[in-house]
């Protein structure tokens, strides 16, 4: 579905000078048809070919790259297409069954076999924002819900099922937040017969159009967490906040700006018991 979203997004840019193939603008996934293909209607250029490649990432499970190749016989049309494609895909989020963000890395000339064709390849890094669920209690989902209560107008990535293409600061919502778990281990609180304690380290990514907007949201959230020293889990039990730290960095989409550490308890399941049947006591003490 992401590939079809990217296709429709490029199509919506209405790039000038695109050829026509089978009645549609010459936009293709991975590879363009041969120049001799009967689907071409007149000229075979300009054209755009995109290639989205995803790979496993131990930290986030999925990441990858996006390459967009543009080829034109008119150098000025190529230059305009480069500008529009870079602007359209830099810091842009695509959300369907998976949410990804594309960030422009570089643009390089593309060598073509036809000397009359000018080509460029735009390279984009792809960062994935996978949805992970934790049972029986989910601190990620619980913190995301807590943040949504404080900031109802933000888009909580991974928590709201809605296909969308989004750029920070453009339209409503103008801000997105993503929560993920760094680690979960045995807690330092003593566990009991009724409850086991777990320590979780969570990260919060606030994606906005400016550092000032992000800092404002982070400041409010940090003050609230430090004041309350807890937030509610899905079952109403508390997540006890022990430490909150914030820092701006150059890799917001990867590391985020806030790290939170705390503990939560999970009630043990009561094992069913059965009474002993069929035993009769006879006789007595002598």
Residue ranges, per PLM feature:
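Short, charged interaction patches at domain edges and termini
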Residues: 1-9, 53-61, 98-153, 184-199, ...
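Hydrophobic beta-strand residues in large extracellular and virion-surface proteins
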Residues: 6, 10, 50, 66-68, ...
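Helix N-terminus capping/helix-initiation residues
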Residues: 12-13, 112, 210
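Extracellular/virion structural assembly segments
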Residues: 59-67, 71-95, 102-105, 192-201, ...
